[in-house]
Amino acid sequence: MYKRTVDLHVHTDNSPDGNHSAMFICEKAELTELRALAFCDHCEIDSFYQDKYDKRIRSSYYEVAMAQSAFRGKVLVLEGIELGQPHYDPELAEKVLAMREYDQVIGSVHNLRNTQDFYYMDSFTEESANDYFNRYLDEILGLLEWGNFDILAHLTYPLRYFYSKSGIIIDMSRYSKKVDEILKLTAEKGKALEVNSAGLRQPIKKLAPEADVVKRFKELGGKYVTFGSDAHFAEDLAAGLTEAYDAMKAAGFNEMTLFQQRTPLLMPIE
């Protein structure tokens, strides 16, 4: 049983797919003795105006601020945001970040350009899945080149949907060179690699990324790792934390990271 329980990827009902308020989730955090959590509601840059993310992120920010005040001394509550596809419109992404002060910014890719989120796609073939995944990795590199974020979220995100919708398992060895390029750039830019446990609650039953990728990140000079449950329900808060911490320790990390005012702080994994 780990004592330093920190979940840095949690969504409220201000995310389109979220289900509970920040206050309700913090009540759950206090009951389960979670030490800290970061709320990181979605802000998909390529559908910012269409899906009214301006209103969503404003509501999220102020509701989290209220939760910070209410739970001060009980749970460390951090202000975050998950920027989806920020490099598709860098000017807008920078404008969003300039509006408010965040403790952490998660960078993610949920969809390729002018396509749906992988979550909404109906099915895949071996050929299409490999094509999508190769292009996804290219977009991750683009995200890193843009660079104004702190945590690289759920690397290998599409794999969970290739499997759940079409039973396809990607041979990761085909992409080892490109994944190494991503991990090396993540390390060089001082970004944290998130170990995301959402896949453990889905048919694929795997972390994103898996332990071997986390280990490779360490080998390539990675310093910062974070845990994110990617909870969209209060009951999923910190779910999979033990498996994620185990993967970090197996990879050679003795410390995990949390961010305050976008500054990384190392904490022992214990």
Question: Where do the language-model regions lie?
Answer:
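A short helix->loop->beta-strand "cap" motif at the edges of active sites that frequently abuts
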Residues: 34, 73-75, 189-191, 222-223
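C-terminal regulatory/interaction regions
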Residues: 249-270
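Conserved, mostly hydrophobic/aromatic
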Residues: 9, 29, 41, 105, ...
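Domain-core and long-helix interface of multi-subunit machines
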Residues: 14-16, 100-101, 107-220
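An N-terminally biased module of ancient metal coordination in phosphate/nucleic-acid-related enzymes
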Residues: 1-90, 94-101, 161-173, 197, ...
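Short acidic/polar active-site loop segments enriched in Thr and Asp
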Residues: 35-36, 103, 150, 223, ...
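Short acidic/histidine-rich active-site segments
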Residues: 42, 155, 222-238, 258-261
